Each structure stands twice: as structure tokens, then as C-alpha cells.
Amino acid sequence: MKTRSKLAAGFLTLMSVATLAACSGKTSNGTNVVTMKGDTITVSDFYDQVKTSKAAQQSMLTLILSRVFDTQYGDKVSDKKVSEAYNKTAKGYGNSFSSALSQAGLTPEGYKQQIRTTMLVEYAVKEAAKKELTEANYKEAYKNYTPETSVQVIKLDAEDKAKSVLKDVKADGADFAKIAKEKTTATDKKVEYKFDSAGTSLPKEVMSAAFKLDKNGVSDVVSTVDSTTYKTSYYIIKVTDKTEKKSDWKSYKNRLKEVILKDKTSDRAFQNKVISKALEKANVKIKDKAFAGILSQYATTSGSSSLKK
């Protein structure tokens, strides 16, 4: 839910701001929302009060993206897909799902709309990425591609322990595989891996170190930091086999296709470019200065003015 909420946070404020904005078009801005002795709070009063808040800014952005992508790609995401994603998340949270929704400021329907908008944007980005499957991009991906490498890995949690184990595995006659099985602190005790440069089974630093080694070569201690827990782990790698890279990029076309699509769809700049084009196609214009900057992250050199005013 956390990932999807980045795209559509603050649905409750969205409901208030968007609804009141709509109401102001149907009724007078002076319509009373609250009355009290000696004073009143009008639609305009409330709108002016909340529209500059961070939640309202995010909510208006969400509403714009929802409308634009639903208009342009609405038939590409079915209610069934949305429900499946919703139910999967609900199952993961179990009995705490309702509480999680409430804490996120979401209703069930609001969260489903959030999921739908995210899926629509993802679809648009994937379709745009497919257009990047050019021969030039295939050749560029091939230059940076390393075919399958087989390794044995020892994972350790302490640097001093890693240095001690490194001495053991580099000693004459050392049985790396045996030491790896005895010393690794990996929860699954796995020590044998195969991967190419597009793999994700091990940290990038570990794979990069492996690619630099010759067959039967043993690395020094390689440290990595988990981006989620910020915990440092230490690795010692031995390469047991290396696949020679073929000279024709077409030999790896299917794998390179995966690489290109993954790189593009995960690239924030590319995502923003796709969203920018959709906004320009919809001729989105911001009429209230309070929201003038909410689309600035999607503004491009051409057409940026239409996204700002």
C-alpha cells in the first residue's frame, strides 16, 4: 500500500477540495458551509483555507492524473484487475487492513481508485518503453551486458569475521565450498549462484566484483548496505565458471529486451516524460494559482507552460 499511496495520497482531502471546487461552480462561493453566532464559514472560506496544504496539493495532483489517464487509457485496466490487487493487499494486512486504510486517510473505494490510477500510469509507461526497443538501444544494452557467471558466495555479518574467513579461503588447499557452507550467515544457507548482469539474486556490488574475477578467482571482502534496513553485510566470492560473451548482440535479444524495458520503466525521468506527454495531450491548464506548481515535476522544455497555467 505504501508504494501505491505515493501516487495518490490524501484522498480524504482530495474529496473535500475537489468536491468543494466542483460545488463552487454550481453554487455561489458564498454558500454557507457552517453558520454560528456572529459569523459563517463559506465554501470559498474553506477552499481558500485548505487548498495550499501539502495534502490538498497532492490530492489535486492525484485527481488530475486520475482523470487524464482514465480518459486516455481507461479501457486498459479492468475492474477485475483492480479488485485482485486490492484483495491481495487486504489479505496481506489481514484483520488490520481497515485500520491501515484509515491511518492512510483512505476509504476502500478511494484506495481502489488509487490502485486503478497507478495501473493506468504503469500501462502507459510500459507502452512507451516498448518504443525504446530500437537496434541502437539493443546494441548499447549489449555493450553493458555480461553473460551468466557461476559463483560460490560466503555472506557474513561482521567485518572482522569476514576478514578472518578470507584468510581461511585463501590459504593453500582451502576448500572454498566447504568453508562457505560452514561459515555463511545467509538465512537460507545458499552458497551457489548463477547470474548475468541483469540478475537480482545478489547485491549489485557483489555481482560487479564477480564479473571482474577470472575463473577460480577469489575476491577480497565486499561490503554492501541494505537500502531498507541500512545494515551492512560482507561477502567473499569465488567464481567457478564464466560464460564467454558472444559477438552478436542478437544472441541475447530476449534478455536485452528485458533489460531495456526494466531500465526504462524504473527510470523516474522516463516515467515523468510519459506523464508529461499525457498531460499535454489532455491540454491540462491550472487556473488557480494555489496549484500552479503541482505539475512542475512533469514540465518539459516544450509545452511546459500549458502544464503550469
Curated annotation (Swiss-Prot):
Where does the UniProt annotation place the signal sequence?
1-22
Where does the record place it? Cell membrane
Q: Has UniProt tagged this entry with the keyword Lipoprotein?
A: yes
Task: Describe the reaction catalysed, as an equation.
Answer: [protein]-peptidylproline (omega=180) = [protein]-peptidylproline (omega=0)
What is this enzyme's EC?
5.2.1.8
**Which segments constitute the PpiC domain?**
146-241
User: What highest taxon heads this organism's lineage?
Assistant: Bacteria
Q: Which GO terms describe its molecular function?
A: peptidyl-prolyl cis-trans isomerase activity
Where do we find S-diacylglycerol cysteine lipid attachment? C23
Q: At which residues does the record annotate a lipid attachment of kind N-palmitoyl cysteine?
A: C23
The UniProt entry, under PROSITE patterns, shows: PPIC_PPIASE_2, PROKAR_LIPOPROTEIN
| GO-annotated biological processes | protein folding
**Any one cellular-component term (Gene Ontology):** plasma membrane
Principal EC category:
isomerase
Arranged from A to Z, the UniProt key words for this protein are: Cell membrane, Isomerase, Lipoprotein, Membrane, Palmitate, Rotamase, Signal
Task: List the InterPro entries.
Answer: Foldase_PrsA, PPIase_dom_sf, PPIase_PpiC, PrsA_foldase, Trigger_fact/SurA_dom_sf
Membrane-protein topology: Lipid-anchor
Supply the Gene3D superfamilies for this chain: 3.10.50.40
UniProt lists the family membership as follows: Belongs to the PrsA family.
Chain's role: Plays a major role in protein secretion by helping the post-translocational extracellular folding of several secreted proteins.
Protein name per Swiss-Prot or TrEMBL? Foldase protein PrsA
| Organism per entry | Streptococcus agalactiae serotype Ia (strain ATCC 27591 / A909 / CDC SS700)
Instruction: Tell me the gene name.
Output: prsA
